[in-house]
Amino acid sequence: MLQYPHINPVALQLGPIKIHWYGLMYLLGIFAGWYLTRYRAKVKPWAPIKPEQVGDLTFYVALGVILGGRIGYIIFYNLPYYFHNPSQMFFLWDGGMSFHGGFIGVLIAFALFARKIGANFFDLGEFVAPVIPIGLGAGRIGNFINGELWGKVTDSPLGMVFPTGGPLPRYPSQLFEFFFEGVVLFSVLWLVTIKKRPRYLVLGLFMFLYGCARFICEFFRQPDPQYGYIFFNWMTMGQILSIPMILLGAVILIAVFIKIRKNKCKNI
């Protein structure tokens, strides 16, 4: 059995002000995304934005992630609770963010920013997709430090006892998601972007691979108590929300490969 490290969720306290690791992980993900996107804007001739526009894009995306992630969590996962405790909606430092809500927020941010600068929405998504897994991985580390979103009870050597998860060891599902949705997904997408490839291949890969990774990792994660298993006595809310991403990613990839066969696909 692995030992849970018991990290204090508060990274720094200045008088009454508490700075939580959870928030710092989001800031780290946003900063890393800004840095790599700016780098790509300098070296990629097909980049839909200029390096000096990356800061504004990052601001739009950060708002989309925070607002969309929080609103998505409230709507998808715990609406009755927040309906009766509306003030809790603003306690972001206690956790409670939805990737799928954040993804919708980012799509809205992309649409608004693309319209502002006159860029193509899908080109913008293709350009930014390789750096998104960094933020996903950072968020999962924040979940792990918070001791939340732990996995199912297990007798596996990978199990650990979480402070709020009862006396039995559980899968550290946050670390599984950090590895597959963060490390593996980033590595695959970044390697694909090194050489020329068909347009929108990376966008399709991101949506398809993330959806698959999340769907699989959900089998190790404890279902949300307010929902449990929703369909077939094994499907969770996270899996249901991942299916549209898998399907849309598959559609994009199929369209790309059809264009390749017809020699109508533009490489970038």
Swiss-Prot record:
Any one Gene Ontology BP term: lipoprotein biosynthetic process
Residue runs in coiled coils: none
EC number annotated for this UniProt entry: 2.5.1.145
Cellular compartment(s): Cell inner membrane
Domain of life: Bacteria
Transferase as UniProt keyword: yes
Major subcellular location class: membrane
Leading EC class: transferase
A Gene Ontology term for the protein's cellular component: plasma membrane
Record pathway: Protein modification; lipoprotein biosynthesis (diacylglyceryl transfer)
Membrane-crossing residue ranges in chain numbering: 14-34, 57-77, 90-110, 117-137, 174-194, 200-220, 240-260
Single annotated GO MF: phosphatidylglycerol-prolipoprotein diacylglyceryl transferase activity
PANTHER family registered for this protein in UniProt: PHOSPHATIDYLGLYCEROL--PROLIPOPROTEIN DIACYLGLYCERYL TRANSFERASE (PTHR30589:SF0), PROLIPOPROTEIN DIACYLGLYCERYL TRANSFERASE (PTHR30589)
Function as written in the Swiss-Prot or TrEMBL entry: Catalyzes the transfer of the diacylglyceryl group from phosphatidylglycerol to the sulfhydryl group of the N-terminal cysteine of a prolipoprotein, the first step in the formation of mature lipoproteins.
Family according to the record: Belongs to the Lgt family.
Record-given protein name: Phosphatidylglycerol--prolipoprotein diacylglyceryl transferase
Source organism per UniProt: Francisella tularensis subsp. tularensis (strain SCHU S4 / Schu 4)
Classification of source organism: Bacteria, Pseudomonadati, Pseudomonadota, Gammaproteobacteria, Thiotrichales
Gene: lgt
